[in-house]
Amino acid sequence: MSNPESLKKQVEPPGYNELFMVEDVCNVDLEQGLDLCKPEKVNKQSQRSRQSRQSLFTNTIKPQKDKMNIKTNKIKEFLNDLFTEFSKFHNSYYPNGRISTQDKSRWVLLIIWSIITILTIDKKFKIKESYLEWIGENQSHSEIWGPIVIYVGLFILLLSAFNYCSKLIIKALPLISMVIAWVGVVIAAFSVIITATIAGVIAAFSVIITATIAGVIAAMVGILYFGHWLVYKILILAFGFKIVTSGDVCVSNTLPTHNGETALHSDATVGSDIEQIELQNMPTPVKK
């Protein structure tokens, strides 16, 4: 007779004994008696799927970011080039660091402007007529000095005011021109953006409209900037300032010393210095 255990093994499905040896029954294939995908394998597969999705996402988004970065870098380079060119143009038209007050005609012009201002004040307030009437009433010469002192004091005050305020005005006008230029650039940029968005509905005329408005604003800013420059040049001539050119700058014969200071060296002193260096370099005689 056959052994009942052998019959039992034939009746039992495959993997029946292994079924109870596994702690998690849900992860077992009942037909083959094999373990299903373990959590580690499942985690690895999920990580691979996530990585594939992330790579797909980065492959689609990264080129767009690169294009945006290229555009922003081009805009930055364009703005930097525009700023450098404008600064060169501005420095050529407004030589603020090369203006000298050593012109001989400066004080003559300031005196003339002070006298003109006094005459204008006198014409408006009629100081001269009242002064002549006062002289006719008071025949004493000692009483005439009061109005004269007033005129002299007013003249000195105006002369010092013209001297000090003219320097401030000449220094402030280049800054005002920079403000005018940058305000014009900002207004032009905003107007171009607004007109481009409004005229975007009519694609055929959007470029023409934006270019026309930008050109009109640029022309207005240019006229204002040029008019400001004319005022600047007129004030330089009127107040007796002098623009120092490269030819006017005299190079002094100063040489740096060992302490970093500068000292005047004539031809005689240079020759004596060379002789001293030669004497120092000569070998000393050895005593026998």
UniProtKB/Swiss-Prot annotation:
One Pfam family this sequence matches: DUF999
Membrane topology: Multi-pass membrane protein
Organism superkingdom: Eukaryota
Transmembrane segments: 107-127, 144-164, 174-194, 198-218
InterPro entries membership: DUF999
A Gene Ontology cellular-component term: endoplasmic reticulum
Assigned keywords, A-Z: Cytoplasm, Endoplasmic reticulum, Membrane, Transmembrane, Transmembrane helix
Subcellular location: Cytoplasm; Endoplasmic reticulum; Membrane
Family: Belongs to the UPF0494 family.
Descriptive protein name: UPF0494 membrane protein C212.04c
Species whose genome carries this gene: Schizosaccharomyces pombe (strain 972 / ATCC 24843) (Fission yeast)
